Amino acid sequence: EEGGRPPPPI
């Protein structure tokens, strides 16, 4: 489920 934490920086 998305919308919890933002994706990690790459």
From Swiss-Prot:
UniProt note on tissues of expression: Expressed by the venom gland.
Gene Ontology biological process terms, A to Z: regulation of blood pressure
Gene Ontology cellular component list: extracellular region
Keyword terms: Hypotensive agent, Metalloenzyme inhibitor, Metalloprotease inhibitor, Protease inhibitor, Secreted
GO molecular function annotation: peptidase inhibitor activity
Coiled coil: none
Compartment(s) of residence: Secreted
Function: This peptide both inhibits the activity of the angiotensin-converting enzyme (ACE) and enhances the action of bradykinin by inhibiting the peptidases that inactivate it. It acts as an indirect hypotensive agent.
Family the UniProt entry places it in: Belongs to the bradykinin-potentiating peptide family.
Name under which the protein is recorded: Bradykinin-potentiating peptide 2
UniProt source species: Bothrops neuwiedi (Neuwied's lancehead)
Lineage: Eukaryota, Metazoa, Chordata, Craniata, Vertebrata
